[in-house]
Amino acid sequence: MFPIECHTLQTSFKQVLSLVAEKITTKAFVIFSVLFSLIIGFIASCGFLFAGPPAFIASGLCFALLVSVVSFFGCQKLIPYGIQHLMSYVKSIPSLSSSLIDFLKTESKSISSLYPNPGLKECFKGASPKYKKFFFDHPEKLLSAAFTDWTPQIIPSDSGQPRTIILSHSSLPFSLTLSTLDFETLHTHLIKSNALTCRVGYAHQLPSGNPVMREAKEGVLQQHYDTGNETFFISIQESKQLQQEELFKKLFSHYAQITEHNLSNEILLLEPLKTPLHTPKARTLELLALFCALEQLRYTKVADWRTKKLAPIFPLDYEDFFTLFMKKQHYTLPGNVSNMRILSPVRPVSETALTTIIISGLEEEDKLGLLGQVQPFLFDAEEAHPQRGESILIQNVLDDITQ
């Protein structure tokens, strides 16, 4: 059972400090500095007033005035410094609620680290320099081509809430459920839901300062619950300026491993991984990494990457891009060629138990996000009620949350 929300004394103290720091205005700061300086000067002048003859009193008043001026300018320097450190202290509060953090720390029966597979960093091995340049110069074209392989369905909501968009792939046995609800809302409801009896996997990004993340190694934490579910926490350092290729490889390797390790679960609740780079090209590469990782499931297992069992096919020239994607002339290409040029022999994935991946925290107003970039492909989407059992179940869960 999900624990009852209960804030600790330290968390409550941090929240009070946060409110105080946010309420401090420039006017209040000046008034405080003046009053503090006058008090210091008054104390100093009183000491000299009773110390001796009038000469000492005059010098004491001058000294008190000097102390007041020094105190005033000292306050101008020290108080903003203190407020800055106060804000950095209170901002270290975890992004998830304390109850969810406690649940993740206490309900797990074992903790082990999942290290990124080094072979995944070689996903462009053998690719021509022209294609790599085209890949990173025009990721929006590749992403648009990837969208054309998914068939959208719009599921109307009975509760009057935003519609649900489901993407289905002809070669993958699971669908993508796009949700505007945040990860914590979906996570909480999926744990509490009595109707949900299937196995659920979770993937959520936490900031590096989160107390759960401090227990992780290499930025990734895997926890096994009593129910057998798995949770992966991915931390991307906010201070590191990732290059485009490093950004793509890092996200691609994480997405590939997360999906690979959740093929035995019926549902995967996934919050898209985000980086501190907010340029249009970086945001597009973030989404492209997800769709490349999903497509890679058709070709090889993560554990078999770079083994002698595989016979990689060298990528085609980048000039064949429009033949492959836009004209969809697959008959001119080998049957085991990966659309994203991440190549290896085809492998069956029909045995997987995974039926849908719920992608949480999407915003319709975010033009660079998944919902924003997929909108042009929804003009011919079918509007129908889901027929598959897991789709009906997911829709019922989403409707229950929004009621």
UniProtKB/Swiss-Prot annotation:
Its subcellular locations are: Cell membrane
Q: Where are the transmembrane segments?
A: 29-49, 55-75
Q: Which UniProt keywords apply?
A: Cell membrane, Membrane, Transmembrane, Transmembrane helix
Q: Name one GO cellular component term.
A: plasma membrane
Q: How does it sit in the membrane?
A: Multi-pass membrane protein
Q: What family does the database annotate?
A: Belongs to the chlamydial CPn_0129/CT_036/TC_0306 family.
Instruction: State what protein this is by name.
Output: Uncharacterized protein CT_036
